[in-house]
């Protein structure tokens, strides 16, 4: 099976574009593929406590349900771009979280570069 890296850029301001990367990840996982998700730009706003449960795109599953499937049922890693989170006030300059993240871990650009090299497919949303 394949190894996929999904890069998400959209946050709760656009529920459709925020949800589709996670829906795609779920479909890939259900087919037996290995999936990691990297959150860039406003997508970092999806992981603080209380956000995902309120992201509902018309006709799509609730974002929180997708995140739970990916992180609890299947243990797929979600990475929060540190620079993007820092620029949006979610992380201090010392790289300490300023909020409670319900899922994901902070990721540095060098990690992203490694993931891109190591994966079979990179999908950007």
Residue ranges and their predicted role:
Residues 1-5:
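Extreme N-terminal starter segment of soluble prokaryotic enzymes
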Residues 6-19, 51, 57:
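Short, glycine-rich nucleotide/cofactor-binding loops
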Residues 18-31, 37:
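Histidine-anchored nucleotide/phosphate-binding helix
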Residues 35-41, 77-84:
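Short internal beta-strands
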Residues 53-57, 96-99:
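Short, hinge-like loop/turn segments at secondary-structure boundaries
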Residues 54-83:
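A glycine-rich helix N-cap at a beta->alpha junction
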Residues 96-114, 118, 123:
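C-terminal structural segments of small proteins and small subunits
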């Amino acid at each position: 099976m394949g190894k996929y890296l999904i890069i998400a850029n959209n946050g709760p301001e656009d529920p459709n574009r925020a949800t589709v990367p996670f829906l795609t990840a779920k479909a890939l996982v259900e087919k037996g593929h290995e999936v990691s998700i990297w959150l860039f730009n406003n997508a970092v706003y999806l992981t603080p406590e209380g956000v995902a449960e309120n992201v509902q795109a018309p006709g799509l599953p609730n974002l929180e349900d997708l995140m739970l499937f990916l992180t609890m049922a299947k243990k797929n890693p979600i990475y929060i771009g540190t620079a993007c989170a820092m620029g949006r006030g979610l992380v201090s300059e010392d790289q300490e979280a300023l909020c409670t993240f319900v899922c994901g871990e902070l990721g540095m650009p060098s990690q992203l570069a490694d993931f891109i090299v190591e994966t079979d497919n990179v999908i950007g949303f």
